[in-house]
């Protein structure tokens, strides 16, 4: 009892702290945490087998696996038009999956298979505490700036509202009423899936989903790198060194989830310090500068983007690349678990018949699941489909080189067949998305612009140097004395965690180099050609580097035989920890005085309406309360990243045309968009009643919203007499002149 008392007290203290900090929002917060706990525990019969070599049996990864399987199955059944997208469907699919896990657990028990981490209570407790702390921390911060307004938030929140209304997927495009969403909407889908599963309100879960992902961005790298460190250093872990795996895991988790880059160190600390020494006024620092450096400082016509998770979690967009963070981290952990399981066995003996051999190679659970995950990325974040097909292929190739004793023909044959298997499975499972998706891909272009060397060094010098140093350290140790000269012998001599770190490092470096050579063409050719390519590739490189550095620094500190590796590792660790200061800088700049709980505003993402859209808030609330389904509500269209489309974004109700640049990117038909824009103007301003009526019928408009943006855009040309003659006023603001018309049909 005495042993458990401190743990119970700590858990109770954290529960009390969460209630104090989150106030009324704590119930939804607890619901999501409890759901993740239960889903992860129920999925352990599957996860425990996949991560059998992990000390925690993949406990943290099990949460993501459960969400992935239940959410993906629900999506597949809905998009295949087998089931409607309702709360009952989400719950039903989850229950069926839970029953399946229960049956599997029963048979495992009969066969003496232990899928739970027996004897690792302290480890599981520690991981759960870390998950709860980071989930609480980010949720609390979000409550200081909860509004789904600014940057991409209208789109992200609008996607969620549209899917909450829809019983089919993809949902009707809220900014293009004649079509369905033509973008990879999977991230917002999973947020809606969890919202329906828990019976929560989307106004709260918009913010909760991003803080949920942020918590996983710490605990998954922690769990993986901790296990890698245990596997590599277990013989050296005596005395005080026993804490090394946990510390390495923490550094990896922090590197992925809250670190910045050396831009913060150079431009926020070093340069201002030098300016003060010279008696000059120190430059101020704005945290987004770390993501808009190449092309902006100095200002040249090659604007790029190089964001990273901490920036995303602070900014608050629930974009595709953000939600997919937890899924790609799960995949990386799964690949390590597979590589480890192969290396823990003896090399495959080729005596079994040809049929049995190929059956075994094609039915590897880890590869089958990896193929499904890669396919799922097509609709969660399409770029990650390409990136992690290559990462998965790299792990498969390196593993097969070792597994098949360096026999080239066998290695190439098996790797090629498994690559085809991954492509085929990923293609099949993503068919419900790809069959309804018009690709935005316009081809690959040769990069005409290149980053300045000093900029690359500031952004990527630290992780690249530490990664290359780790690779040199590992290879040098194995080549000493003339041993392991062949590629196979060298790779065979390298331990599993070292080999996996090398794969992650090579992939990360490749992702940095690619935008310097080629880019994917899109609508941003003029001055921003490399922006999207660099953004999506280097975002993943950042996470791979974070885990590689977390592992590599402590691996070299403990196990390197040359002092130079240890010295550089210490320097690297100091610089890496210095980048953690970005977290504090950005949190204060964006959220304000987070140390004052009284400033907490709550998680309601629509709370900004009362101040920013005073004239429209009552009308928007009326639509949310009274209009069911997805009828077309006409509002004035406007530019992307503006206050236009506040009605469709906050209600999920489709309008004829929304943010122009977004629809241009998604549909690439400016003539059509311009025609719709002109038609909307005609509806609001034309004096020809019959013509307006024809347009309303053509676009199947059910409601017309007349509020602040409509008066701002059309001014005195707004023909309210014609509009009112074509419908009934169903809402009239008592204070302002905003009203809603229901069109006569």
Show where each model-derived region lies.
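Extracytoplasmic
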Residues: 584-745
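Active-site lumenal/periplasmic loops and adjacent helix-entry segments of GT-C-fold
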Residues: 26-30, 34, 119-129, 133-330, ...
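Membrane-interface alpha helices of multi-pass inner-membrane proteins
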Residues: 312-315, 368-380
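Membrane-embedded, hydrophobic transmembrane alpha-helices
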Residues: 1-122, 422, 427-478, 507-515, ...
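Transmembrane-embedded, aromatic-rich helix segments that form part
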Residues: 327, 384-395
């Amino acid at each position: 009892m005495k042993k458990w008392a401190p743990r119970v007290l700590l858990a109770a203290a954290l529960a009390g702290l969460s209630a104090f900090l989150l106030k009324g929002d704590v119930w939804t917060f607890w619901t999501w945490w409890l759901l993740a706990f239960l889903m992860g525990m129920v999925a352990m019969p599957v996860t425990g087998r996949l991560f059998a070599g992990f000390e925690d049996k993949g406990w943290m990864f099990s949460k993501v696996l459960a969400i992935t399987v239940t959410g993906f199955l629900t999506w597949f059944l809905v998009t295949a038009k087998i089931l409607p997208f309702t709360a009952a469907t989400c719950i039903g699919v989850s229950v069926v999956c839970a029953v399946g896990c229960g049956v599997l657990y029963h048979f495992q028990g009969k066969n003496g298979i232990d899928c739970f981490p027996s004897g690792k209570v302290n480890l599981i407790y520690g991981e759960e505490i870390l998950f709860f702390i980071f989930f609480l921390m980010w949720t609390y911060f979000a409550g200081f700036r909860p509004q789904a307004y600014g940057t991409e938030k209208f789109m992200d929140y609008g996607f969620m509202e549209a899917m909450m209304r829809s019983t089919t997927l993809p949902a009707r495009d809220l900014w293009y009423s004649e079509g369905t969403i033509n973008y990879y909407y999977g991230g917002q889908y999973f947020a809606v899936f969890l919202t329906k599963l828990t019976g929560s309100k989307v106004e709260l879960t918009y913010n909760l989903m991003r803080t949920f992902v942020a918590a996983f961005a710490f605990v998954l790298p922690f769990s993986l790198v901790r296990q890698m460190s245990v596997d590599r250093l277990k013989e050296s872990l005596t005395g005080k060194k026993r804490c090394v795996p946990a510390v390495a895991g923490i550094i990896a988790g922090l590197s992925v989830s809250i670190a910045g880059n050396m831009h913060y160190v150079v431009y926020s600390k070093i340069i201002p310090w030098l300016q003060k020494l010279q008696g000059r006024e120190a430059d101020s620092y704005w945290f987004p500068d770390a993501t808009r450096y190449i092309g902006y400082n100095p200002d040249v016509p090659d604007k790029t983007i190089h964001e990273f998770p901490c920036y995303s979690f602070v900014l608050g967009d629930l974009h595709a690349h953000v939600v997919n963070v937890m899924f790609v981290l799960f995949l990386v952990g799964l690949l390590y678990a597979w590589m480890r399981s192969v290396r823990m066995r003896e090399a495959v003996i080729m005596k079994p018949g040809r049929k049995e051999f190929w059956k075994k190679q094609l039915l590897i659970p880890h590869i089958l699941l990896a193929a499904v995950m890669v396919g799922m990325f097509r609709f969660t974040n399409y770029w990650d489909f390409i990136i992690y097909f290559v990462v998965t292929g790299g792990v498969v190739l390196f593993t097969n080189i070792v597994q098949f004793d360096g026999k080239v023909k066998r290695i190439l044959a098996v790797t090629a067949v498994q690559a085809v298997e991954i492509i085929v499975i990923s293609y099949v499972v993503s068919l419900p998305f790809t069959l309804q998706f018009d690709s935005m891909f316009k081809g690959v272009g040769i990069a005409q612009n290149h980053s300045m060397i000093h900029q690359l060094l500031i952004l990527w010098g630290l992780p690249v140097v530490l990664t290359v140093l780790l690779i040199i350290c590992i290879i040098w140790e194995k080549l000493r004395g003339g041993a392991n000269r062949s590629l196979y012998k060298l790779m065979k001599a390298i331990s599993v965690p070292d080999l996996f770190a090398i794969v992650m490092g090579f992939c990360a470096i490749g992702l940095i180099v690619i935008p310097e050579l080629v880019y994917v063409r899109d609508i941003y050719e003029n001055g921003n050609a490399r922006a999207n390519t660099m953004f999506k590739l280097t975002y993943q490189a950042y996470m791979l580097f974070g885990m590689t550095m977390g592992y590599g620094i402590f691996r070299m500190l403990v196990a390197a035989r040359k002092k130079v590796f240890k010295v550089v590792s210490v320097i690297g660790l100091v610089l890496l920890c210095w980048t953690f200061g970005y977290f504090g800088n950005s949190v204060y700049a964006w959220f304000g005085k987070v140390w004052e709980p009284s400033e907490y505003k709550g998680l309601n993402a629509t709370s900004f309406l009362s101040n920013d859209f005073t004239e429209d808030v009552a009308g928007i609330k009326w639509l949310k309360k009274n209009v069911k389904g997805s009828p077309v509500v006409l509002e004035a269209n406007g530019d992307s990243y503006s206050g236009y489309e506040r009605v469709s974004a906050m209600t999920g109700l489709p309008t004829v045309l929304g943010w122009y640049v977004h629809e241009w990117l998604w549909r690439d038909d400016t003539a059509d968009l311009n025609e719709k824009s002109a038609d909307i103007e005609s509806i609001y301003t034309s004096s020809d009643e019959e013509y307006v009526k024809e347009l309303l019928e053509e676009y199947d408009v059910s409601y017309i919203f007349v509020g602040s943006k409509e008066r701002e855009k059309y001014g005195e040309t707004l023909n309210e007499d014609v509009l009112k003659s074509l419908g009934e006023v169903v809402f009239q603001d008592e204070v302002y002149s905003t009203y809603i018309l229901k069109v006569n049909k």
